[in-house]
Structure formats: C-alpha cells, structure tokens
From Swiss-Prot:
Main function: mRNA splicing factor that regulates the formation of epithelial cell-specific isoforms. Specifically regulates the expression of FGFR2-IIIb, an epithelial cell-specific isoform of FGFR2. Also regulates the splicing of CD44, CTNND1, ENAH, 3 transcripts that undergo changes in splicing during the epithelial-to-mesenchymal transition (EMT). Acts by directly binding specific sequences in mRNAs. Binds the GU-rich sequence motifs in the ISE/ISS-3, a cis-element regulatory region present in the mRNA of FGFR2.
Top-rank lineage group of the source organism: Eukaryota
Name of the protein in its database record: Epithelial splicing regulatory protein 2
Keywords: mRNA processing, mRNA splicing, Nucleus, Phosphoprotein, Repeat, RNA-binding
Chain ranges of the RRM domain: 247-343, 348-428, 465-545
Length: 717
C-alpha cells in the first residue's frame, strides 16, 4: 500500500520579506540529538576516548511547533567493553552492541531519516541541537577522524541548548552547569518519570524545553549556531600580539615527524585559532615533541584539556595548561620578510636543510623540479641567514596543496651539487623560531664575567704519593670511596680526595687521592686494585702530584703517557704576555652582592717582580673547573672554584719578560673569524680601564698578532 503524500506546508510569511524584516530568522527545523559512549557520561563525555554506542534524535519544526518521529540507533563499537557507569545507565550489553551497525552506516541512516522527517513537517534546512558541546566536539568529530570518515556538513554547525537556555534565563546557573533535568525543572515542565529507555527521556525532555523557549522567544533564540572548523588555518603571529592565558595548552609526547596539521587533527572538533599551532624546537633547531596550541576561547581550551593522554597513532599525548606569553615566545616574530612570506593563506610549508652555502633560488627551484612548483616561484622561498648575511643552509618553501608538498617530500635526501638535502614538513611557528634564533644570536654571546681567580698552588713533585681511581660508578660518593679503600682511608691526607668532572660538569668516573707517603700510596694501590664497587671493578694506580694537577686542569693521563692540558699545547705565539698599569676593576654593585669580598679584586695592586702564568680549565665556554675537591681540603687543595696557577716547576721554563705591574689579562678562545673589535669590546662592556693606565703597547713576538688601542679598552687580536 502506497503511503499518502505528505501534507503541504502551512502557509507562512514570505521568506524574502521575513529575511528583510527579521535580522536573525529562526531555522526551518531543529534536530534534537543525544548520544552516549561506552565510557564516561555527562560532562566527561568523550574524555576517555571511547567509541560512540548510541544515537537518539527527533526533529522539531520551530514555526509550526510540530515534532517528528523519535529514532534510536545503536552503534557497533570496536572496543565492546562497557564501563560500569554506562552499563548501569543504559542497560546495554556487549552482545547487543556486537549486532549493531557501524558508525558510517548509522550516519547514513541518520541523514536519510532526518531528511524524510523534515520533508513531512514541511521544513527546510535543518540544524542540530545538542545538550552541551561534548557530543559533537569530543565524540563524533574525533572518532570520525580516527576512522577516516567524512561527516556531512550538517555536523559542522549546531545549537547548544544550554547556551540558548541561559541566554533567555540569565539568572540561572552558568550554562556549563546546566543539565536537561535542571532546565526542565526551572521551566516548571512535567517530565515522564516512568520512561526508562536510555536516551529517550533526554530527547523528549529537550524537545519540551525547546518548545517552551520558542513560545517566549524574542527573535534572538536559535539565531547564532556554534561552528566547528573544518580546516586548520595557518598564519603568522607577531611578538606584539596579546594572547589570553586561558586559551593556550601545551601538548607533549608528539611524534618528531608530526606537523601542525597532525596536531590539528588530534584536536579535531575544537576550534584552533589561525596560526595557533606552534611546534617547539630544541637548542639544535630540531623538534622536541612538544607544541603550544592556541584556541579561539577558553571553553575550547577546557575541552582540549580533557584530551589528556588521548592517542596519536600508538603514542599518547599529554595536554597541560600553558600561558599566552609562552605561545608568543615560540610563535611570535618581528621580521617583515617572514610576515610577508607567511601572509599567503592555505599554503603547505616545507623546510629544506643542508643546502650548499652558494645555493640560490634558481638552484632550489631546479632541485625541486617542475613537478612540484613552489608558490610564487622565488618569492615562495625564504632563506635563513646569519645576522651578517652568511647563509645557514636552511630554507623554507611554500606549496599550494598537499599533493605538491608530497611530491616535494619525495626529493628527501636528493643531491644538490655534492650535498644531499633533507626535506621536512614545517609550520609558521617553526619558521619564526628558526629565524628568531639566528637573528638574535650575536657573534660573541655576552656572558656573565667569571669570578676573579684566587691563587691556591698545588704542591708539585715527582714522588708518586697519590693514587688514581679509574672506573668509578658515576653515582659513587665520597663515603663510597672511603669505604672502598678500607684501612687505607686512614692514610689519606686532610682534604686529599679529588673527584674529576667531565666537560658537562658530571662525574667522569675518575678520582685522585693524596696519601701520606709514597709507600702508603703504593700499598693502597696493591691492596685495592681491581676491587669491586657497586658491580664495577675499579683500577687503582699510583701517580705523582704533578700528574694529578695536570689532569685536574684539563689534561689526560692514560697508559700511553701524560697529555698536557689544552693551555700547555704548542701555540703560534709565546705563552707570555707583558702587563701594564691597572686600576681597580670596575665591578657592578649587583655583582659584588653575589660573591664574598675575598673573591673580588683588591682595591689596589701590589707591584710584583713576576706573575705566575694561569692554567685555563678547558674550552672557553666552561666556566667551572673540571674537578671537585672533597674530604676536607688541606692547604694544597682549593677551597673555591677558579683558575689554578702553574706549579713552581713550570715557572723555570717560562721567559722572564714581564712588566713591573701585573695586569688583568683575559685570553679568549674560539673567537669567530668574522668578529670585529666592536664584537670583542661588547663582551667587556662593564669592565673598562681608565685612559691614563695604558701608555705603552705590549711587546709581542708574532708579527701577525697586533695590539689595538681603544679609548677605554685594550684588544689584542
């Protein structure tokens, strides 16, 4: 039997006239939608990343106040295990869910049934209406993204019944705290308390609330739907931008190859601000697995925090609160060139690394080839350079679509000249970070001046009255060493235990111990050699004080012999420097408050016939000694960290060409070849000398080395 045709729609106002007179026309139809997952319900819906198991919906025609048929559909979940809360509230079982349809088929049925009901009611385009935002933003969109399903356009806009209710009844509690039951209670509606079908009572009550709200509507109700962004939009961020602290989160644990689009997909359903994904880089310019994400409002940020420990592939991602200042620090920039480069919308950014320094736009475009053209040709390339204009070997390229970017990525590790080029996906924030890092790095970083040295000579000698412990556990303490030596610990000199640190300031596994005599040092070595300490055997060998001091100052002592510290290696010029008259050093007041007076220069220098040379502890970036003295220090061990003076035996071999007054000389190692005098002087800007204190030039023995005289500084290049 053929069903009768649907009745014609009731006469209504002319749409053209209505749209002209009513700036906010009501929608033709509303689809009240309720859903549940196999896990948490209520405000925590979707926070546990469980699959959707139930959809209940009913159509409401606002103009005629008619309602359609109520529909309920189960959804087959991949993980059929139900939480106790869901099992108790729904009464469902794993067997009933196993016989249900998959999500894609349920969505097809939903579209067909809703279209039929809307046609029967004489409505037009319809909009979804839900109780809160969790169902669409936290459940449907993320699950569809995980399963690679394409949602209909109708799922990208909806009305939040709680927000519409709060708009008409602002005296109630906040929209976030409302529920279907509290809304019906505030309106004085009678609900069917006997309805025990899970989801049906909620939809019927929501329909009753909507019809009651429509009766007292002033034309503003159901006029501004919530929008779910379909695509993440890239864009630049300026250092001058003000970012609300309540809109930023930090995601940690991202795969190193993930892009901003991957991060946006992880937060699918939430509205990320334009250019709101900033991947963080480490000190080497590589991604560290973290990202800062900026959302359009605080409500989106709160929903993002509920995705803590959700999965991206096989990895779970941690989500924490962050600040707007952190986001601007990572994503913000000040370069107009970068702003113009990033001003093109809907572009895919790739980073090229390892370019030859002589490569130009023509070379890069030829490397990529005609099959993957760069947007704008040479204008779509951005080369990263040092502050002095030298190329770094990095560049960024823009591509119009994902297909062209994929074609360019196939050139990964392709050859350009004699070098292979690496290609990676990039983001606008990464462009800003890389450019900011190179633009802000000076030729010579200005470091805080180290403490001025206090001499504490080590007693030199060739007698092997010390022992060296090699192969110590890195966690070994002074107590472990004393326990390891046993009875020999009683023969240690006061303050005679010295731990050796590596270039990073961590224990190196070596230690030196000063014994009372050569005989006791030999006895300790014979008794303790290759004894076990914490599952490791330790070598104990005798050595002299001179050998110990050289190792502590940066040299090495191995089976092949003694290697001197770096400062004692052969150099182009003699290791002696003439000195000049010097006034008291100008030390800032804030610096003097940090250190004891004994660590600062005296008020006036005392003339001396000769000044011992200084040993340098290692590279110029090392501001600490590479040893630590324990077990209380004797007169022969340092009590503060600083530079060591040379042993007395080293003074006999040094020339005696010295001036009558000792000067404050500083030796700088690792200076860039392009550094000029201004770069050198900027390092010592707080330690100038008076102009009357240098009247002569320092004699040098190497013609290429020259002395430059400045109004307030001495510079020896």
């Amino acid at each position: 039997m053929t069903p009768p045709p649907p009745p014609p729609p009731p006469p209504g106002p002319d749409p053209a006239v209505d749209s002209a007179t009513d700036p906010c026309p009501e929608p033709q139809s509303l689809v009240v939608l309720f859903g549940a997952t196999a896990g948490a319900l209520g405000p925590d819906l979707g926070s546990d990343e469980t699959d959707l198991i139930l959809l209940v919906w009913q159509v409401v025609e606002p103009r005629s106040r008619q309602v359609g048929t109520l529909h309920k559909s189960l959804v087959r979940a991949e993980a059929a295990a139900l939480s106790p809360q869901c099992r108790e509230a729904s009464g469902l079982s794993a067997d009933s869910l196993a016989r249900a349809e998959s999500l894609d088929k349920v969505l097809q049925q939903f579209s067909q049934l809703v279209s039929g009901d809307v046609a029967l009611l004489g409505g037009g385009p319809y909009v979804l209406c839900t109780d809160g935002q969790q169902l669409l933003r936290q459940v449907l969109h993320p699950e569809a993204s995980r399963k690679n399903l394409v949602l209909p356009d109708t799922f990208f806009s909806f009305y939040d019944l709680r927000r519409e209710f709060h708009m008409q009844h602002p005296s109630t509690c906040s929209a976030r705290d409302l529920t279907v039951g509290t809304m019906a209670q505030d309106l004085g509606l009678e609900t069917d308390a006997t309805e025990d079908d899970f989801g049906v009572w909620e939809v019927k009550t929501m329909v009753a609330v909507i019809l009651h709200l429509l009766e007292g509507s002033n034309g503003q109700l159901f006029s501004k739907p919530e929008v779910v962004k379909q695509k993440y939009e890239t864009g630049p961020c300026s250092k001058a931008d003000v970012v609300d602290n309540e809109t930023v989160v930090r995601a940690r644990g991202l795969p190193w190859q993930s892009s901003d689009q991957d991060v946006a997909r992880f937060f699918k359903g939430l509205n990320i601000a334009r250019g709101g994904v900033a991947l963080c880089l480490n000190a080497q310019g590589r991604r560290n697995g973290e990202a800062l994400i900026r959302f359009v409002d605080s409500e989106q940020r709160d929903l993002a925090l509920q995705r803590h420990k959700h999965h991206m592939g096989v990895r779970y991602i941690e989500v924490y609160k962050a600040t707007g200042e952190e986001f601007v620090k990572i994503a913000g920039g000040t370069s107009l060139e970068v702003a113009r480069f990033l001003s093109r919308e809907d572009q895919v950014i790739l980073r090229l690394r390892g370019l030859p320094f002589s490569a130009g736009p023509t070379d890069v475009l030829g490397f990529l080839g005609p099959e993957c053209p760069v947007t704008g040709g040479a204008d779509g390339l951005l080369f990263v350079r040092h502050p002095d204009g030298r190329p770094t070997g990095d560049a960024f390229a823009l591509f119009a679509c994902e297909e062209l970017a994929q074609a360019a990525l196939r050139r990964h590790k392709g050859m350009l000249g004699k070098r292979y080029i690496e290609l990676f996906r990039s983001t606008a924030a990464e462009v800003q970070q890389v450019l900011n890092r190179y633009a802000a790095s000076p030729l010579l970083p200005t470091l805080t001046a180290p403490l001025l040295p206090i001499p504490f000579p080590l007693a030199g000698g060739t007698g092997r009255d010390c022992v060296r412990l090699r192969g110590l556990p890195y966690t070994a303490t002074i107590e472990d060493i004393l326990s390891f030596l046993g009875e020999a610990a009683a023969d240690i000199r006061p303050h005679g235990v010295h731990m050796v640190l590596n270039q990073q300031g961590r224990p190196s596994g070596d230690a030196f111990i000063q014994m009372m005599s050569v005989e006791r040092a030999l006895a300790a070595a014979q008794r303790c050699h290759k004894k076990m300490m914490k599952e490791r055997y330790v070598e104990v060998v005798p050595c002299s004080t001179e050998e110990m001091s050289r190792v502590l100052m940066g040299g090495s002592l191995s089976r092949s012999g003694l290697s001197p510290p770096p400062c004692k290696l052969p150099c182009l010029s003699p290791p002696t420097y003439a000195t000049f008259q010097a006034t008291p050093a100008l030390i800032p007041t804030e610096t003097t408050a940090l250190y004891p007076s004994s660590a600062l220069l005296p008020a006036a220098r005392v003339p001396a016939a000769a000044t011992p040379l200084a040993y340098y502890p290692g590279p110029a970036t090392q501001l600490y000694m590479n040893y630590t003295a324990y077990y209380p220090s004797p007169p022969v061990s340092p009590t503060t960290v600083g530079y060591l003076t040379t042993p007395p035996t080293a003074l006999a071999s040094t020339p005696t060409t010295m001036l009558s007054q000792p000067g404050a000389l500083v030796r700088m190692q690792g200076v860039p070849y392009t550094a000029g005098m201004k770069d050198l002087l900027s390092v010592f800007q707080a330690y100038q000398l008076a102009p009357d204190d240098y009247t002569t030039l320092m004699p040098v023995g190497d013609p290429p080395r020259t002395v430059l005289q400045a109004p307030k500084e001495w510079v020896c290049l």
